[in-house]
Amino acid sequence: HYMKSKGIHLSLENGVTAIEETNTGLHITLTKGAVNADMLIMAIGVRPDTALAKQAGIALNERGAIIVDAHMKTSAKDVYAVGDAIEITDSITEQKGYIPLAGPANKQGRIAADNICGIASTYPGTQGSSILKIFDMIVASTGINEKTAKRLGLCYDKAYTFSGNHADYYPGAVKMAIKTIFDKTNGKILGAQIVGFEGSDKRCDVFSTAIRAGMTAYDLTKLELCYAPPFGSAKDPINMAGFVIENLLTQKVKQIHWHDVQNLPKDDSI
């Protein structure tokens, strides 16, 4: 609804099959239908530009990213690599992957420089903290998402919370939707995704810190975060996520996910 309110038309699950240049612009053929446009922006992800490394005989993975060790060293003697060109280790799952982000790239550069200068330093891995802004809306993520947790067969669960970015009685309060991925066995926070407005970035950073520190939902309930009505609530959205997960882990409450509703018994027992 937010995107539509801004005049954005979403054509989902509808791929581009052909692009034709015309006298008035572009004619774009889709799987279902077609559109005419002055400009086409293809935002289809990135891939490592490692042709030089390949020519030099440096080991690459199947996606073409340079393989490095924890010291950022490649397979070639005295050659180091960092940034968008390299394969990384996921700090949560310890799986190899490709996450090209500026923050990790800068930290990798410092670690490579340390090792080149004889200072033993290791890179602890990437957890994929990222954020973007769509008009005034903020979409932020850190750690693993449910798709990854499911693919790896992790013993996980998820909790959805909808909390105000600051005290409801203070003007301008809006809700943020938070999805938290956690380990069902011990409550350890594995990932979080947030969609909201002002204040969503701060909460994602708190989740990022919590994940890096190996914190659990129980720890989230105890966090003492800055509070004044213009900035937050006495029970911060982070605390609320912790409370909800704690209630689930201690079986104070049960939750039924939206995708399970169709499988519920039809005898009014629930």
PLM segments and residue spans:
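Mid-to-C-terminal Rossmann-like scaffold of FAD/NAD(P)H-dependent oxidoreductases
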Residues: A85-E198, P229-S233, P237-S269
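N-terminal glycine-rich dinucleotide-binding loop that anchors FAD/FMN and/or NAD(P) in oxidoreductases
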Residues: H1-N14, I144-E146
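Short, surface-exposed charged micro-motifs
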Residues: A18, H71, K179-I181
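General small-molecule cofactor/ligand-binding pocket signal
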Residues: H9-S11, Y80, D157-A159
